[in-house]
């Protein structure tokens, strides 16, 4: 297993035919579009395009509002949180730092880890997250204290872990303790090339979640691509029912969900809507 820890058939008819065609379409898109692991993925440009300004405000306002309500109300609580979210994004952790003493960040590529650490260590060239931090502080009624909030978040990051999602085993438990909450923001459909991989990856992400622990999963619905610079990248297209059923099959009881339809006009991204599922771990599901 490769990881690093930085501390600070036959086609029949109808349904079978449809599934086969759906799989073929996904394979074609996967082969013609770039992938998250490709060298052309620019971590800083990606963040500047989607998450540090008002280009696509739904990407931030939808999850930030939900997470503020969950973490600040105490509906989700504990000491340790595992963040398996997209790229070097941090805004989903701002409210979480009010509730959790330790946050572990899992990422899949060296460039994204490097860029996340640039922010963590205040290095030159790091992404400026002041816009998101001010937005998060507005929810708390103290917009002017965003710099204090940023320092609070930095101190809460207990580790940054690299994991190759093509490995069968998740992170060594000696490096990552059992956690009270797993937060997954936009990541599953980006790193999973098939629905089977989506299911396996969700099981792996949540294997270190304590029984009774909580999963907060954000996913794009019926999305096929996103653009970074001059490149179009693949994303696995899944519908709401598939996401819900996968969460249940993985051993979770869904407690609440939120859905918002697309409300913007842009060629950068083609999602139909965004879904958030809050679920509680009921049992272990073999990988």
Give the ranges of each region predicted by the language model.
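Conserved class I S-adenosyl-L-methionine
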Residues: 76-89, 103-107
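Acceptor-substrate binding/catalytic loop of class I
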Residues: 193, 223-242, 267
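S-adenosyl-L-methionine
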Residues: 121-171
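A short glycine-rich, Lys/Arg-flanked "PGG" loop and its adjoining helix->strand segment in the class I
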Residues: 176, 197-211
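Core SAM-dependent methyltransferase catalytic element
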Residues: 250, 263-287
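Class I SAM-dependent methyltransferase Rossmann-like catalytic core
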Residues: 18-78, 91
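A short acidic, Gly/Pro-enriched loop at the edge of an enzyme's catalytic core
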Residues: 169-182
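Conserved beta-strand signature within the Rossmann-like core of class I S-adenosyl-L-methionine
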Residues: 212-220
């Amino acid at each position: 297993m490769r990881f690093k820890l930085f501390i600070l058939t036959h086609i029949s008819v109808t349904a079978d035919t449809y599934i086969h065609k759906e799989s073929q379409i996904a394979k074609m898109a996967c082969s013609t579009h770039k992938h998250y692991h490709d060298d052309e993925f620019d971590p800083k440009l990606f963040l500047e395009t989607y998450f540090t300004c008002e280009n696509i405000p739904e990407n931030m306002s939808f999850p930030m509002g939900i997470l503020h309500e969950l973490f600040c109300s105490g509906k989700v609580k504990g000491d340790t949180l595992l963040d398996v979210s997209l790229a070097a994004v941090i805004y989903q952790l701002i409210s979480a730092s009010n509730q959790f003493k330790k946050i572990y960040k899992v990422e899949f590529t060296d460039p994204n880890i490097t860029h996340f650490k640039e922010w963590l260590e205040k290095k030159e060239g790091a992404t400026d997250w002041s816009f998101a931090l001010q937005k998060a502080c507005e929810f708390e009624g103290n917009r002017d204290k965003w710099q204090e909030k940023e320092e609070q978040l930095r101190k809460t990051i207990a580790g940054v872990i690299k994991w190759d999602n093509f490995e069968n085993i998740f992170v060594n438990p000696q490096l990552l303790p059992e956690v009270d909450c797993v937060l997954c923001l936009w990541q599953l459909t980006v790193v999973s090339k098939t629905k089977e991989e989506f299911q396996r990856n969700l099981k792996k992400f949540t294997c270190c979640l304590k029984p009774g622990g909580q999963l907060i999963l954000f996913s794009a619905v019926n999305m096929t691509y996103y653009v970074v610079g001059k490149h179009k990248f693949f994303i696995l297209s899944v519908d709401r029912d598939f996401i819900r059923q996968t969460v249940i099959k993985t051993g979770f009881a869904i407690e609440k969900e939120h859905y918002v339809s697309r409300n913007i006009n842009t060629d950068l991204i083609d999602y139909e809507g965004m879904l958030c599922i809050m679920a509680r771990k009921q049992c272990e599901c073999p990988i």
